Amino acid sequence: MDNQELIEELLEIYDIVKQVGDYIIALQINSDDDFDYTIYRNGEELDGGIIENPDGLEEITPEIFTEIMKMHDIKEEN
């Protein structure tokens, strides 16, 4: 499965899916209003986790992606 097919499949489950180089970050707000994410690299699931949402944000902001990228040392390609 190529990255585009994986992204399309993940969009059926997750709220937002973003590709950064070889990585795909899939992110959603779970039933506890926290941010649930999974990271894929080259089509394979690599890691994932939950980021608490103490401010009760109702939408996913770019800062959440930035935090995930920093935690997993993923860098934007220029």
Region locations from a protein language model:
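Short, intrinsically disordered, mixed-charge
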Residues: 12, 66, 70-74
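Short acidic DE-rich linear segments
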Residues: 2-4, 73-78
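Acidic, low-complexity, intrinsically disordered interaction modules
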Residues: 17-69
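Serine/threonine-rich, low-complexity intrinsically disordered segments
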Residues: 9, 40-41, 76
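Negatively charged, low-complexity tracts enriched in Asp/Glu with abundant Ser/Thr
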Residues: 1-24
